[in-house]
């Protein structure tokens, strides 16, 4: 077929429709190739034959339109089977189908026939008919441009770069005006594109420096193709945005495919190249990559064909990768490995070096391709591939940097020397490659590399002789020890080789030291020194003695044989030794052997494994390496390695640690003092000026009265000439009114003087080298201010900071001389790199431009595209900004301003926005509107609430994923990322108010049964959000949303890597529901959507996880989560999956009004809301402590007062203090995250100790039943009943009525056995919690309540501080007791073997046992006290503690999960502070049943963790590091602890180190005895306290623990009268004080007893109420003989009515006993009764039972009384007078009524406790009722009194009987 200019359409059609062509097409279709994909095979099928014919015709018309005047002729077979085949393959792909083929065909036929060509059904989805008209103008314009380019190829090939751009511009503008005037009118910026492209070309040239010399034409081709495609895509998108056209026509695709490919075809066919098909495919690959990148990025969001796949974004790196992958398969088969490189680029954050390496490989492939296919040997391609692959430019810059460092300091330290040696090694490798022929480069580049190597050698020669004589890094020593013939030398040599490779050093970087040689012959500061057979031969000085000064930071001059090397200092970085000896020789004359031992940083012993034979290929295969450290008089094996790899890794890690430590040490030594060099400089400067002042000046000085003469004349900063005089003292003054005719004379005199001065300073033998090298900076006039102050930098910043004070201290006249010198010299500093670069550019420019001129255009385009891609930084910045510009009007403005440059004038003010008045902030950053958003940003409260509560980010490494928080400690995420996160790791969770750590566990992921792209993650460590947030989600969006489109919003928060902040964004969108197939891809991940939301807006990478919000039933709700995007024009969201909403046990959140934005947020707390109006929580505001009369104080000092319970307490005066705020603030700052590996090691050790205490027969850890949880077990130590008088918690407290008490109103029982009352709020909440706590962490609400206690006066008047405790809900406490009661029993029972001392009896022998156990380790004891211990615990530690307890207790997986969730709930809860609601995310609440146990375990974990970390830092042997129990004895009780430390390790582990280490983790610890002390020192045991008790030794075996006296006196000043009368409460206290004082001194106790009897009236009457000293002594003797448990934390709890003064049980032998006819005493322990139903035939009188009155049956009465002290179980005197002795009391009346109504029924007096007081009360009631006569009662009671002495008060009180 012949193509020629002026060819008619009929000529081409005749060829296309000829039978011969049809036959060839049939043959082509039948020709199947291996590389044919499914689309190529499809188009060759019979049914697609017409499409194939149209494609072939389009190609022929393209050729016909592209030929020049001379015409071309192509063989028909070649045209069909090679050129057409290659063309088809470039336009058809499996992923895009035939989309590109349609676009190209449409453009060609539009250009040829000026009409739209229909291709049957193939383009029905591609182009709607009504768009043809408006598209025509644009299509004609592009086709015209495409037709023009081929006809100009010949001419363009000879143009300069400027000509290429101008030619493009000229025709581009002409066609625009002719075919598409609306584009010019609407988008005037399109005509300025080419000016911008010129700037980009220049920018690219500057970026690539010398290697681009002569390549402007290539860059121009590349930039024109890339930027032209980009501009056309932008133009088209802008016209769509402005409404001028309604859809995209892929202008960029038509442009690059038709124009550039056509130009190429013309060239190759003209030259009759036999490889035209290959070249066609090559250039098509290149321009295809460009087209797909630009058009996909800037596609218009409307009018597109429906696509069935979602894609990622494109950019520069992606373009290169695409090109590389295609070229890999296409070019030389031996270069397939490049594909792996390209894939690797995806998996890393692309760095410049990686891109350069990729470009180098691409150019290398093209070089091979050009040579093999075209016979073209390209110098430029070879040079460029080497320069990019080896980063020659970076290598040269590093050489220049080394030279600058040497000149700046006149020396090079060892680190810089190692860089220098590494550069030499790289240079030698490149030289070797060039010599061996592996690297072919031009002579200029070869000379450049040789020049670099030569100058490096010169620099090295000078550098090795100029080391630092100051402080240096201590060398790193590896010392291999072992018997002879075990391979020590071989393993050391292998270590040297591996270290050399690691540091990129050459083979000459190792110096073998012979210790027998007196001189260091051949030492050139090699970084590695090896000493083989260390100490094997005797020498003087010995090898050991020589090593000590070498391995030091002090300077060490060497003994050199050559005079020229004298003064060299040792500063090698690494010393490797092998030796048969591990210790110093006795003859070594080393006086301090520790000095030698400490100089070996890695010491290992080599031995052979007898079970593994020697292997010549791997001599280390049968070696064993034992890492050893010296500690406490012996060597300890720290680790044993059986493989060399492990040893190498260990050595490398130690090397890094050592290097880091040495760098930190050197940084601390920066002392600023005047350099000796500057002292010299100042004296030489004085001398220079003196010598060079002419005789006339000195004569003037002598003759003038003030000795003043002309000094210098110079131009100031404004260019004005000024003259100055000077006197003998050096005072300088400006001369005024100088005759201008003298200017030249004075200037000449000045010039002579200052130039002579400069030469003298420069060449004077005494001028320091540093000054000489930095003189250019000192005389630079631009670095001086108008008053001659120096304000520049001298050399390196470090050097400048050291000498700047000296420069500024120079006298004014000296600074003026330096300034004037610089003016006269006018020098500029040029680096070594700049010098060689300029020379190289001159040589390369001509060679490259000559060569490139003759290249085929195809090669120019491909290479130009690659170079423009890697070098066009300015273009890619523009590209990125446009990719983010969105759609619509914002996009049009962004493009116009980007291309307009400085021509456009932009208004500086902006339209006011009503939203700006109170702009919503998220994470303290204003929410911004997306560029393409159309609506005005006006967010309502529900939208803000969604952002605040539900939006979060999951951050790991440098990746930030958006997630959606749900109530119940869970979040929603997307599969395509989270399904691949299969390893546990620490991540950061960023919420609206804070950031916190989460230990991510893959097993916590939950997949939904549906094919949802969304997945769920649950974790107890997540911070919860309010349950009310469930209302913000729409889980049935498909049903709730309208059909078709509806308005919605998209909310996102993505990481801005420039500012490293998460930026919140909002936009309005139009969404629609779609039900059709959508393929989604992410790397290798693939999935299919069948039902989703779609919105046609510009979404981009990292948008996944954004919230889609719409209005449902009048309220904003989350309807979906963005999970995919397509071509920067469409977004897709998955519907919210159906998440099970957990039931809340408390349902407490309904009482809260949540704030829209949290307040007062810290890491641990944040205020989230307030109690709703009308909700009030009763809290104590007045103390229950009553002050006693002064005479009852017994002369003791008042040291304590009741705590402050409210902010209105009068004792506060003017101080602003709220105890509630103070209580919540202790949780504000929890401690930091701990090293998980070490923490788990500690936990494992503790659990092992627990298992050691387990008795399999007795210790079972199953959960107990509810009754046991409430009542405890009778006779079972440590399992007491729940205190019934304490608060029931929230929200149950809201229903409490006046007179009702706490938990007691929710239980019923007979006084001994209690149960929950069915149907109450507590009972229902208990059932719900039991059911749900295995599945979710319960939402816990606690009431913060100030503690009513006695505090030191300083905490009242000086710095008020009231402790708060937390009241937790009753049902939570009951469930916790059920799950953990057996564990608590176990810990308390084994306190003699464990650290936790909860339950210890301080009066018995346990205190002695405690003291003796501490003294076993010695008498070095740390007595510690924590600050705000309650708020320190983090979720990390709490979760670990749950794992520890589960490990010990076992049980089903459900029970284990229940335990974990219950524990996690208490350190992530709500706290009520008066009317405020706070979120608390750390700490253990004090009202938690396990508080003291958990605090004790936490205390132990902290100390043991600190011990290991401190030992690791001290590098002690592993046997010590992991031997805590061997070297330390620790006891804990909550936050109290004592540590007894063995003397052997007190230098490693002491109070100072413990205090400093804990401080690093946010924990403050002080001396427990003296809390104001700034230090924590060891104490003797007698000087310590524990539980506010001291240690006093009474004998060798007995220690007592007296309570501190300040606490004792307070008991005499204040008493608690909750359950007792005042004098009874005081009696309890005074007895306790006398007992405690007895432990201090029996004489003091006896004296206090006497004072009490003398001063207290009621004690005068009954002195026997106070125990005598003998009785107290007997009390302690009795205590020491028994193992009593003390389960109460303090004395005040002893006054609890549940435990108070119950006499030893005097039970009846039988279940019943008849007192009088029909009146029986009944022991419920033997004959129980159902108290809720009673018994039909009798009246039941329950004594001291607990049952609400409204639940009592008709014939059941309950009588409860408060116990009185010392009254034998009878009620208090006051209650007895009112109810027992009074015949008309309410109790007596109630009994009388019942008996009268049921005269035939028997009466059972039912009781559970002591029968005696019940019998007494019954007798008295019988007297009142007339059933017993007074005389009979008298006799009966008298018998009882005779057997119970405590009842002798009865005759005085009960006068109705006695």
From Swiss-Prot:
ATP binds at residues 482-489. The active site is at 976 (for picornain 3c-like protease activity), 1013 (for picornain 3c-like protease activity), 1104 (for picornain 3c-like protease activity). Residues 1419-1549 form the RdRp catalytic domain. It holds the Pfam family RdRP_1. The chain crosses the membrane at residues 885-905. Keywords: ATP-binding, Covalent protein-RNA linkage, Helicase, Host cytoplasm, Host endoplasmic reticulum, Host membrane, Hydrolase, Membrane, Nucleotide-binding, Nucleotidyltransferase, Phosphoprotein, Protease, RNA-directed RNA polymerase, Thiol protease, Transferase, Transmembrane, Transmembrane helix, Viral RNA replication. Residues 936-1141 form the Peptidase C3 domain. One of its GO terms (molecular function) is RNA binding. The keyword Membrane applies. It comes from the Viruses. Its EC number is 3.6.4.-, 3.4.22.-, 2.7.7.48. One of its GO terms (biological process) is viral RNA genome replication. The modification O-(5'-phospho-RNA)-serine is found at residue 909. The record marks 313-314, 908-909, 936-937, 1146-1147 as: Cleavage. It catalyses: RNA(n) + a ribonucleoside 5'-triphosphate = RNA(n+1) + diphosphate. GO terms for cellular component: host cell endoplasmic reticulum; host cell membrane; host cell perinuclear region of cytoplasm; membrane. Residues 450-621 form the SF3 helicase domain. This is RNA1 polyprotein.
